[in-house]
A protein has these predicted regions:
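Extracellular, repeat-based ectodomains that mediate carbohydrate processing or recognition
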Residues: 1-171
Length: 171
């Protein structure tokens, strides 16, 4: 058993649709999780990441969602081990005024700009839903995501499908 970090609850592991752990045989393991920061005990929605070449020693990265559009309300994180970069993707529970919709589901992602183990996750994180420019997001209220990596010719493509929690049939 390897202790990597702390989480107040296991939102990344609560659903069979998320992929909190991803492996690239040439790079290693990348993990995404809902992180608990002891010096900020009121919030449990920080997004963290961990990297390991061998699955035994992990380096952790904290607070990936502290800048807009992140609101430190991350849910359902997933990791995608791309050929060159590790990606961390999650749903941010946002207020309706920041584009997530009535129930606040806004898919967001970041990646380690310095490759695996580089420790420089892109900030601010970016919208995965390209319908968020301009706000509000269209479609809104995207919550639990299922992600995978495929290739178009030789270029990696991240595929994502989200459940939509909307109170309106029109949405």
């Amino acid at each position: 058993i390897v202790l990597i970090d702390s989480s107040l609850n296991g939102y990344g592991l609560v659903s069979g649709y998320t992929t909190p752990l991803s492996y690239n045989p040439n790079q290693g393991f990348i993990m995404a999780y809902r992180q608990w920061i002891p010096d900020d005990p009121e919030k449990s929605g920080y997004i963290g990441s961990a990297f390991s070449e061998d699955g035994e020693k992990f380096v952790t990265y904290s607070r990936l969602n502290v800048e807009d559009p992140g609101e430190v309300m991350g849910r359902y994180p997933s990791a995608v081990a791309g050929p060159a970069y590790p990606y961390i993707i999650w749903n941010e529970y946002t207020s309706p005024s920041t584009g997530g919709g009535q129930y606040g589901g806004r898919p967001i992602y970041t990646w380690d700009e310095f490759y695996y183990g580089g420790g420089s996750f892109f900030s601010p994180p970016l919208d995965l839903n390209n319908g968020c420019n301009p706000l509000p997001c269209d479609p809104p209220d995207n919550w639990v995501g299922s992600l995978s990596l495929s290739y178009k010719e030789q270029n990696p493509v991240i595929n994502a499908i989200y459940s939509q929690w909307s109170g309106s049939i029109a949405e």
